[in-house]
Amino acid sequence: MKKATSLSELGFDAGDASSGFFRPVSGDSSTPTSQHHRRRLTKVSVIGAGNVGMAIAQTILTRDLADEIALVDAVPDKLRGEMLDLQHAAAFLPRTRLVSGTDMSVTRGSDLVIVTAGARQIQGETRLDLLQRNVALFRKIVPPLAEQSHDALLLVVSNPVDVLTYVAWKLSGFPASRVIGSGTNLDSSRFRFLLAEHLDVNAQDVQAYMVGEHGDSSVAVWSSVSVAGMPVLKSLQESHRCFDEEALEGIRRAVVDSAYEVISLKGYTSWAIGYSVASLAASLLRDQRRIHPVSVLARGFHGIPDGTTSSSACPPRRPRRRPGRREMELTEEEAKRLRRSAKTIWENCQLLGL
């Protein structure tokens, strides 16, 4: 019996087979492949390739949120190394184009720009001095970013995030609806985790928010905390489990201190903020209408001074949509604490003279 020496001798015609696997491209504008029917490609830029920036980029990549990710950093060798490390995993990841550069031109045409770059605090340096250095850095990077991507959404992650969100808004020239900060989105996740541990439930079944400053003065909104629709404070009362203001403040304090604990153990935080920002990116890019506590320009929220950027629960969305902001219901004590927290942010903003 004669052995076949080619696919054609087996009756398999390569030309015919290719037509089965690959659809011909037509220049006819009425075909589904025309420009009118093509899905618009999504581009996300991450400014700063440090631990936080790369955790964000990696999480956005694995969640398949963008068709192109641009990485920008001032250190070219580290930047290229980070990009190559991700590119080498291409066989295991969604198909996403990765580009990098030290120049802001690589971000051109971005839909979402995420800023993680920031100066690190020097020993003995005051918070105000650190803030002034970060403002100087933002003066260098924000205007070029705005110039490269006129219609982008700007998401600030650098700390102090509430004040720097205000700075980015002022320097970009963008409307306030297109500049937000990561705010207390991560604080709220930590809050939900700690409550879930206390109550022995899944954190995804806990509804709880931290608002105000992303920092020491953040406010836990206990009045709206619920598990499976049951208000937590009411549930504790009905089960005769003891709690008092001191216990509640202890949990809030644990939320605030949790970042310091992670830093003391591993030197920095990265993964939690990576997932937090990726969740914001998904909500913004896909218009999911999910509620997030993010830093936004507060205009009359519970008596907070106009021009203050502070975290409030709202559904961040593309500006073409109707405004998503809605005022949370707070007790008078919670509103008082929120105003006190916002005052700290407002005072720092006034010192900058922007």
Curated annotation (Swiss-Prot):
Keyword Oxidoreductase assigned: yes
Involved pathway(s): Fermentation; pyruvate fermentation to lactate; (S)-lactate from pyruvate: step 1/1
Gene3D superfamilies: Lactate dehydrogenase/glycoside hydrolase, family 4, C-terminal, NAD(P)-binding Rossmann-like Domain
NCBIfam families the UniProt entry points to: L-LDH-NAD
Binding, substrate: 127, 159, 190, 269
Species annotation: Zea mays
PANTHER family attached to this UniProt entry: L-2-HYDROXYCARBOXYLATE DEHYDROGENASE (NAD(P)(+)), L-LACTATE DEHYDROGENASE
Region (Disordered): 302-332
Name of this chain's protein: L-lactate dehydrogenase
Molecular function as annotated in GO: L-lactate dehydrogenase activity
Stored Pfam families: Ldh_1_C, Ldh_1_N
Taxonomic superkingdom: Eukaryota
E.C. designation(s): 1.1.1.27
